[in-house]
Every structure is written in C-alpha cells, then in structure tokens.
C-alpha cells in the first residue's frame, strides 16, 4: 500500500501575533483547536504542504513555528499531527472562533488533557515570555519577520533587491530554510539549531569558499552572531537516482577538496570546524561504549530501535579493537583534513566545473577517510541499490587521489580501518543531535544512533 491509503489529521495551535492568546473553535459547542484532514501523510517540516490547510481555516497567511505532536497508527493508516503557527498580521478571528488566554482556557480544560489544555499550556508560555525555543529561535513569534527583513536588506546592499515575498521552505528541529526571489534569481536563507557539534555554517562556508574556490558555494551574506546566511540558488542536489558515472565523480572531487584543505587545518579550526581527530574519537569510544552497556539503552530511543543487550556487550568488547584501529590509522601517512560529516548525494550539486558540496553543518577536522562512511549508506543509482562492485569502484576512485601518500595496499588497509571509525563518528554525531531534540523529532531521529553503532560492529576490521 502507498501513502495514498493514509489519512492525515492536522490540528493547529494558532498563537496571536502580539498577545498571549490562542485561537479556539467554538462552533461545536465546546472548545477545539482548528483542524483539517487530508489524504496521504505529511512531512512535518514542509510549510508549503501544511500551511494551505491553515489558510483555508483562517482566510489569512500564517507562519509555521514548529511541530508539537505526531503519531501514526499503521493499522488504521492514520497520521495525527499538531503544529504551532502564528498569523502574519493581527486580525479578528474567523466566525465561530475566538482568541482566548490562559485563564479562560485553564477553566475550560478543567484538568483534562484535551485541546483546551494544550492551548492553555501554549498561552501560558506566551504570557510568561517563553515563546520559542532557545536552540531553535525560528519557533518564536516575530522571528520570521526579523529574518525576512535582514534578508531583504542584505540583498539590497549587494544590488539584488527582492522581487517577491520571503517563503518558508523547511522548518524543523535542526534547521530553518527560507527562499526569496531577487532581480538576480532566487536566494536561500539558512540557519541551524544550536547543537554542540554543529558549526556556524555561514562563517565556515565563507572560509571554505575562500580556500577551496568553486567546490563550496560562497554565501552572499552572513550574520555570524545570529548564525544566518544567504546562498545563491545553485540548481538543486544530485539526488539519489543518478547514473553511476556521475556518482564516481563525487568521491574523486571530494578527495581533491580534502587534499587542498589538508594544508589549512589550523585555519579551519579557527573558522569553527570542530577538532574530531582520531585521538578524540578514541577517547569517545573508550568512555561512551562501555557506559552504553551499563545503561542498557540509548536515551530518547524508540523501543523498536534499541540495541539489544548482546549488541551493547559487543560494542563494549569492541573498544580495544577500535582503539587499535585509531592507533594504526594514525600511523598512516594520510594527514588530518576537512571532513564534511554528512556527505551524501543530496548534499552535492552539479557545478560548472564539477561537483559542489554544501550543507556543512557537521564540518570538522578529522581523518579524511571517515567521510566515506555516509557515501556507502544505502545510496541508489538509477533506481538500484549500490552493489559491492560499484562500492569498490567508488573506494578505488577515492583512494587513487591519495596515491602520493601511501602505496595501494596501505591505502586499502587505511580504508578498512576507517570504516568502523567513520560509523562511530556518525554515531557520536547523532547522539549529540538527539540529546538536544524535542518530541516528536527525537523519536524519529534516535534510531540513526543505533543504526550507526550496528554499522560499527559490522565493519570491524580483522
């Protein structure tokens, strides 16, 4: 069965633009949040898919702030979601609806966990000045208008004024993406959540573009203090279904980028790339993996994706081999360099002189071979899963660029050592991300930590 067999229920907690009140529907005799239904399922971070249903209810444009709740019933083929939004301008409520504050809502809720109770909680947060989320400022009322004004002013300064409205493209727990038309084509605004292993992406991309040229898009504008940047439209990503010969150019080009970056490690660190070299990864393995066995599970993990006790014990037992792999890999001549941290085909675009690499949120300095862990993960070419032969070709294309450092057999051994370490690097990254997420996204992303830890066990070298 396809998603077309599903039904999505969408509830809206609509906050007043300036007052600590929430919109409630009185037409049914009680108090209910505005709601809509639609066929299929919705992605909770896509304003273009979600906001039309709210526009039908309000008769006005609104800004999506965040997803508050999501659950699915596969048997009934039902998806239930709740979102927080705010109208672009203050206006009287639609017929049969009313703006209500915490006191009115609390009395109506009478201790029940229903629509009025949820609305009362949000109204209380607004009244107490807790609008938004410190890690994700775009969830606050008024943030969108500030960001849109900065974007417009930035484009005016470089002679490319906006020719239309700023639109939300993606709003979720990890980042916010806006788009706007200008006299020179569309531009993209991006900001990321505060997370311990995330970088100030605009600052880092300015540095990378200066050092590495066209392989990294240069931001048109950066607000370093607020973590905002604007990028030109560069035509979209490669996508997951492209011919193998196109994909082979990705590891080749990326290896050349890393070779150039290897001479600028201190500059990369000063720009804000995290230091995640092998000695740090070894320390994380030694401290974290045995603790996992003692805890018995991963925090914020959905029960279906918890590691088994046997897997946890195997990870703890693997620590000496992982430490040995770190030590042996450090003994190879390949130097530390720039690591992307999320290198896959959806973060690569076609450029005039070859692949261009974007989405540098996880950028760091580490062993360069760690990056190829993500290229191996479930990528499709022309609609078919990558076969072992093609993966070997991608490996060989990548390793050939490092031939000046080691003979082929030594490079192949370094690759073998790097596979479980790259998986561990990813597991550490996801652990850091999930620790700062709020429901319901934490439940969906937490499984990635377990996936990568299982990959550590699968890729351990002999």
List PLM regions with ranges.
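Conserved Nudix-box catalytic region and its N-terminal flanking loop in Nudix hydrolases
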Residues: 6-61, 69-72
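ATP-binding pocket architecture of kinase catalytic cores
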Residues: 32, 74-75, 79-111, 167-278, ...
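A short coil-to-beta-strand element that immediately follows conserved catalytic motifs
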Residues: 60-70, 161-168
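Juxta-kinase regulatory segment immediately upstream of eukaryotic protein kinase catalytic domains
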Residues: 110-166
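An alpha-helical support segment within catalytic cores of ATP-dependent transferases
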Residues: 142-161, 263-273, 277-339, 403-411
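Active-site acidic catalytic loop and adjacent metal/ATP-binding pocket
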Residues: 167-183, 188-189, 219, 320-372
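Active-site activation/catalytic loop segments of kinase-like enzymes and analogous catalytic loops
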Residues: 355, 368-406, 420-439
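Helical subdomain adjoining the active site within ATP-dependent kinase catalytic cores
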Residues: 425-462
